[in-house]
Amino acid sequence: MSKKIGLFYGTQTGKTESVAEIIRDEFGNDVVTLHDVSQAEVTDLNDYQYLIIGCPTWNIGELQSDWEGLYSELDDVDFNGKLVAYFGTGDQIGYADNFQDAIGILEEKISQRGGKTVGYWSTDGYDFNDSKALRNGKFVGLALDEDNQSDLTDDRIKSWVAQLKSEFGL
């Protein structure tokens, strides 16, 4: 496979970057190109048919600062024909009322611009009150809690990447 997937992530503490690297490795280094959004241009999103968007939920239901800076520029990208998967890091105990909100905010914007969401993830095994990342009872993407459930991260990533390989047709 040639590098078909662009994985764009923002990170504040390094957790989301670490997860991005694990996801890349699970797909295969020759398939996924990582882009730290603090150093990327929004036009870089145009280079890929398949996208993976990673963002931690910051503060109380907010986008991570690098994504916040690019958010309005997403209006300039045509996502029609692109399959887009999302993953987020968050704390379901400390922030139970807005767990994974950031990926819900990004998914809504990108879907409005024509992106087709793939990689929905079950809420089974999570304990939270509310999330902007819910669509029809599922998360819009892989929900990770490195604060309270880090022991589940590797297995969740393996399952999600297998699901994405099928949905991306790889």
Swiss-Prot record:
For biological process, the GO terms are: electron transport chain
SUPFAM superfamilies for the chain: Flavoproteins
Superkingdom of origin organism? Bacteria
The secretion signal range is none
Keywords noted in UniProt: Electron transport, Flavoprotein, FMN, Transport
PROSITE patterns per UniProt: FLAVODOXIN (PS00201), FLAVODOXIN_LIKE (PS50902)
Q: Where is the Flavodoxin-like domain?
A: 5-165
Q: Which regions span the lipid bilayer?
A: none
Q: Which Pfam families match?
A: Flavodoxin_1
Q: Matching PANTHER family, A to Z?
A: FLAVODOXIN 1, FLAVODOXIN 2
Name-wise, this protein is Flavodoxin
Gene designation: isiB
